[in-house]
A protein has these predicted regions:
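EAL-family c-di-GMP phosphodiesterase catalytic domain
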Residues: 42, 75-78, 120-122, 202-210, ...
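Residues within the DNA-recognition helix of helix-turn-helix
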Residues: 45-48
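Helix-turn-helix DNA-binding segment
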Residues: 1-41
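Active-site core of bacterial EAL-family cyclic-dinucleotide phosphodiesterase domains
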Residues: 72-134, 309, 316-318
Length: 341
């Protein structure tokens, strides 16, 4: 008998149907069409159902997208802009999807892959630069980061740790307490926890250590746990010298803009040489992105850059083509016990 006419706190039938469809791998579009409901209604049913399941069975939480994120007390979901709500909804309906771009060594042998985001929005596929700048909410950044981390874990498991997968950590997430929890969840989801070195985090160069002292602490704690940390966007157009005495990274990635400028700007070339020399002295890796021609590849290789990313190596591919790209770039390279960033 119900007390005071209240309904039990279990799943409703629509919520159960939504959860079963999610766990069976049905796309949001197919499930919404089959049930004759809108994507928004399906999203609300999934969200409500997942919340109830996690409350009663917290051990199931790591298997759900974004479940390791603690809601920000100062920033409830209702405070998101209309664009950010649409973006979070697109993540759950899989309209935001990953693509993978290879990172190769000087022999053009595969070392890793960076995971990039694309958005199938209203029939057009948006590149990351077309929607990421419009995200201001910390919560929206956390949900997107959790989504990409989950893709990285799945691919490390699927491909037995053959190469590393790099995930971008935006400045808004770099100092957040949730980052450490998310990474611990990711480690637990790896079939072999020692493969955590295959999960590389790219911190944006505009992460402000002076303003957010927590960022440096997060980086240090992540490195102690075995994760490899890379500084992304070195010497970009808006670059300021990162406090390298405060934080030491495992790798440094030259921004595409300075790679493009090096052939006509002696100052840009000098900066590249200085970073390469610093990496050699500190036993760090030096990568270059935006390598879109054989000429750039050869010049950077001659300077001492040891890893390369760009269309001259391979264009980004969808998850269904990752194995094929890995085979194309594996060549006859000898297997290594560890994967250096």
């Amino acid at each position: 008998m119900r007390a005071f006419g209240k309904r039990p706190a279990g799943l409703t039938r629509p919520e159960l149907d939504a959860i079963l469809g999610l766990l069976c791998g049905y796309s949001a579009s197919a499930q919404a069409k089959r049930r004759g409901i809108s994507h928004k209604t399906l999203y609300n049913q999934r969200t409500a159902g997942l919340k109830k399941m996690v409350e009663h069975h917290p051990e199931m939480a790591p298997g759900f997208p974004g479940s390791q994120i603690r809601e920000q007390k100062s920033e409830p979901i209702a405070a998101l802009s209309a664009f950010e709500r649409e973006l979070v909804h697109a993540i759950h309906t899989r309209h935001i999807f990953p693509v993978f771009q290879a990172i190769a060594d000087e022999r053009r042998q595969l070392k890793g892959m960076e995971i990039l985001s694309r958005w199938n929005r209203n029939g057009s596929v948006l590149l990351a630069d077309e929607f990421l700048p419009q995200i201001g909410s910390e919560y929206a950044w956390l949900v997107l980061t959790a989504f990409v981390l989950q893709e990285a874990v799945q691919n490390i498991n699927r491909h037995s740790g053959e190469c590393y997968f790099a995930v971008n950590i935006p400045a808004a997430v770099a100092s957040n307490d949730n980052l450490l929890r998310m990474m611990e969840t990711a480690r637990q989801q790896l079939r072999q926890p020692q493969r955590s070195q295959r999960l590389v985090l790219e911190f944006a160069e505009n992460s402000d250590l002076n303003r957010h002292g927590k960022t440096a602490d997060n980086i240090a704690r992540l490195q102690k746990r075995g994760f490899r940390i890379m500084l992304d966007g070195c010497f970009s157009q808006s670059s300021v010298m990162f406090p390298v005495r405060t934080v030491r990274f495992n790798a440094y990635k030259l921004d595409m803009s300075i790679v493009n400028d090096m052939q006509r700007d002696p100052h840009a070339l000098a900066l590249i040489k200085s970073l390469i020399h610093y990496c050699q002295l500190t036993d760090s890796r030096c990568l270059a992105e935006g390598v879109d021609s054989r000429d750039k590849f050869n010049k950077l290789k001659a300077l001492g850059v040891d890893s390369f990313q760009g269309d001259a190596i391979a264009a980004p591919v969808g998850r269904e083509n990752v194995a094929e790209m890995m085979a194309e770039l594996s060549g006859e390279a000898e297997p290594q016990s560890g994967v250096a960033v």
